[in-house]
Amino acid sequence: MALSFLSPSLSRLGLWASVVILMVTVLKLLSLLFRRQKLARALDSFPGPPKHWLFGHALEIQKTGGLDKVVTWTEQFPYAHPLWLGQFIVFLNIYEPDYAKAVYSRGDPKAAYVYDFFLQWIGKGLLVLEGPKWFQHRKLLTPGFHYDVLKPYVAIFAESTRVMLDKWEKKASENKSFDIFCDVGHMALDTLMKCTFGKGDSGLSHSDNSYYLAVSDLTLLMQQRIDSFQYHNDFIYWLTPHGRRFLRACQIAHDHTDHVIRQRKAALQDEKEQKKLQERRHLDFLDILLGARDESGIKLSDADLRAEVDTFMFEGHDTTTSGISWFLYCMALYPMHQQRCREEVREILGDRDSFQWDDLAQMTYLTMCMKECFRLYPPVPQVYRQLSKPVTFVDGRSLPAGSLISLHIYALHRNSAVWPDPEVFDPLRFSPENMTGRHPFAFMPFSAGPRNCIGQQFAMNEMKVVTALCLLRFEFSPDPSKIPIKVPQLILRSKNGIHLYLKPLGPGSGK
């Protein structure tokens, strides 16, 4: 009897709930349509390639890999063009120096649409912070990249590299090409562990190391999420196997970072441990962070510490891996330049068997080759901003505040209007006389402006030491049957690895 009395009320309640859900859905749809109309109006003055009625340019980019397709679009649409990801997300894709300067000289925040996916792992570190807190963190972290701090790292770079090269000696003896990318990634993470946490032995000599696997997994999963529209909603993503895998990897990475920070803080409370730290040859990145204070004496919170350490591990590991791997690929493709770099390094070392800080500045030809490699294969092929205020470009066209910008560094570096014969590998583009008068935003491997890469000197030093030691130990040549397939996955990777043949150069060649 009671149930029959309640059933009309429940029916009415269900009806009202359905009406409310329908109204919310309609309002949401109207909001999206209004937003799309507003975005389309803002981009009226920017013609672009034809797009799919539902997916925008996403299918074309997924089908072609996007990188070289955008390069062809630079010829059809000078300066920039709209890039639609579906019907409701659009970036102005720019690849011209004056357009890049108009945005990247200002310090606009990173585009939340892209970088919010990073928050679960790296938190609010320097990469995603904005406003006064970004400025405070940038100021606190800058001393960590002073040359006095960087000097002792040269020996650490060399130590980790030699472990990798010994492994390559065994692989080279099989007279088969092999993929260098994973080994370089292992070495780069090993180096970062030592420079960040001060570990004499990071424990990364085993392929099943949980932290290494977690960091590798996280970068791959983040790119997959950015590329898959169905994963953009948090609620949906965390219910998927990929989402759960991401959370597990995050937990492993966070547990490791928290453990190391707790250990170091405890050591700073112990007099004996304090003395050991003072007697160490160098400060590591964590030392710098723990000692950082602003003008008011305020230090970084535990959450800030973890965010900056995780950010440094993320940005410093994969980008360096990409830069070194593609550089060695370029050296394999161009044996004349490879030999000239090798001879330069031998001349600098003379009778010595180890590098010193002052040697790095003398690697002029190797540096030119490295920059030319970065031009053709930038470690980070795209970066994103969201305009905090309107911008007017050099040709008079403008965009309102809130607009999303994609700086396509890969297309900028291969833009024939900026770089003559852009597909030709020519290190002399970066000779002092040829660099004179070049637009400061024509070459942006480390971004540019106030939000440029704070660790670029650290990265350049590491890549010089690593590649110089590689060239002293081996002669590199390509495998024509396994040409790398470029793919952007936050960094520039190869879909099928970077397979090279290595020929040992014998005793006295840098071992």
From Swiss-Prot:
Responsible for mutagenic activation of 3-methoxy-4-aminoazobenzene (3-MeO-AAB); a potent procarcinogen. Also active on 2-aminofluorene and 2-aminoanthracene. InterPro entries: Cyt_P450, Cyt_P450_CS, Cyt_P450_E_grp-I, Cyt_P450_sf, Cytochrome_P450_Monoox. GO terms for molecular function: heme binding; heterocyclic compound binding; iron ion binding; oxidoreductase activity, acting on paired donors, with incorporation or reduction of molecular oxygen, reduced flavin or flavoprotein as one donor, and incorporation of one atom of oxygen. It is found in: Endoplasmic reticulum membrane; Microsome membrane. This is Cytochrome P450 4B1. Pfam families: p450. Its main location: endoplasmic reticulum. The gene is Cyp4b1. It catalyses: an organic molecule + reduced [NADPH--hemoprotein reductase] + O2 = an alcohol + oxidized [NADPH--hemoprotein reductase] + H2O + H(+).
